[in-house]
Amino acid sequence: MAIRVSDILDKPIYTTTAIYVGKVYDVMLDLNKGVISGLIVSDIQNGCLKDYVTDPSKKVVLPFNLITAIGNIILVKPPADSGYGFLKK
């Protein structure tokens, strides 16, 4: 399935357990492999990661391997612990 990057910008991101994470701000590309490596997530201050980052007004990188579905919203596997799979941007 092909999808345009512009089609996922500003889409809300939720865990598979229906907890709000944030919104897609941008996409990270791995130019060596030619694949999307992660999503840059904004609106962290309103999502489930706000207590796990030092500055919730910043953005975080969500590794692409955590994404389970892309549609009207983006679904991700919930982190196993406070920092699993999430990197500060």
Curated annotation (Swiss-Prot):
SUPFAM superfamilies: PRC-barrel domain. InterPro entries: PRC-brl_dom, PRC_barrel-like_sf. Gene3D superfamilies: PRC-barrel domain. PANTHER family: PRC-BARREL DOMAIN PROTEIN (PTHR38137), PRC-BARREL DOMAIN-CONTAINING PROTEIN (PTHR38137:SF1). This is Uncharacterized protein MJ0916. The lineage of its organism: Archaea, Methanobacteriati, Methanobacteriota, Methanomada group, Methanococci.
